[in-house]
Amino acid sequence: MEVKTMLLLLYPRCTTCQKAKKWLDDNHVEYTERHIVEDNPTYEELREWYSQSGLPIKKFFNTSGLRYKELNLKDKIPTMTEDELLKLLATDGMLVKRPFVVNGDRILTGFKEKEWSDALL
């Protein structure tokens, strides 16, 4: 059975992503890094990760980001279908909550040290 390396999607200039990456390195957690904007998640990936995660779809959105605010998504999300939301996320990596971790069937959005410790160490 092939063991997949953990995937870390991040935006390199994001300070939270930098902290998360440092935390992973300090704790000797192996990962493959992927630029969330240059190689944004596809619709298929997002659908799979969403179904695996058990998280509400809003947790996948970067709600403090400029694009989220520009598109007035706070008001639009409640009126959109799950499929529409996943397609929207796939159009722009800046809409996706970061850092974003895929570790087998475990999905982590944002960097919360306690949550990451419990899930990854």
Regions found by a protein language model. Give the residues of each.
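A short alpha-helix capping/helix-coil boundary motif
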Residues: 1, 25-27, 64-65, 76
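Intrinsic disorder/low-complexity signal
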Residues: 1-2, 91
